[in-house]
Design a protein with these regions (language model features):
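A composition/biophysics-driven feature that prefers long, compositionally simple stretches
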Residues: 1-134
Length: 134
């Protein structure tokens, strides 16, 4: 464990502060940092994008946070996308967040697997007047 667990209320408050400062009709997308190769056989230690961690507490590669406070669909106001996990991934790469543990960590109620990102984004992006990208 890199650090002691952080109360998810901190991340809920951080997202609420951001939502207050966003322009009306705005959508914000925060992407995880990439896993960088060190050579042909290995990768460097993963370090999460600061903004994604600040707003969600998620410290996992291939994660995306979408904030859309003015969405007409309540469940699309905060969405977290994670890499789908299974027992084999846990053995070879280490334990990853499930949808339940992601909610416990971040306080984001709507969690999808990252392979659904384009489908979900396509359904909500037309409502947005402004888009923020990290």
């Amino acid at each position: 464990m890199k650090y002691l667990p952080i109360d998810s209320n901190l991340f809920v408050k951080n997202r609420a502060k951001l939502a207050e400062r966003m322009m009306p009709g705005s959508l914000a997308i925060f992407n995880a940092n990439d896993v960088l190769p060190s050579n042909a056989d290995g990768t460097m230690a993963f370090r999460q994008n600061n903004e994604l961690f600040y707003f969600s507490g998620v410290d996992q590669e291939e994660s995306i946070l979408v904030l859309f406070p003015d969405s007409t669909v309540e469940k699309h106001r905060e969405i977290l996308f994670l890499r789908e996990t299974n027992e084999e991934i846990a053995i070879w790469e280490g334990e990853k967040l499930t949808k339940e543990t992601a909610y416990d960590t971040s306080g984001v109620k709507t969690v999808y697997w990252v392979q659904d990102f384009h489908k979900i984004l396509r359904s909500i992006i037309y409502e947005a007047e402004t888009i923020y990208l990290n």
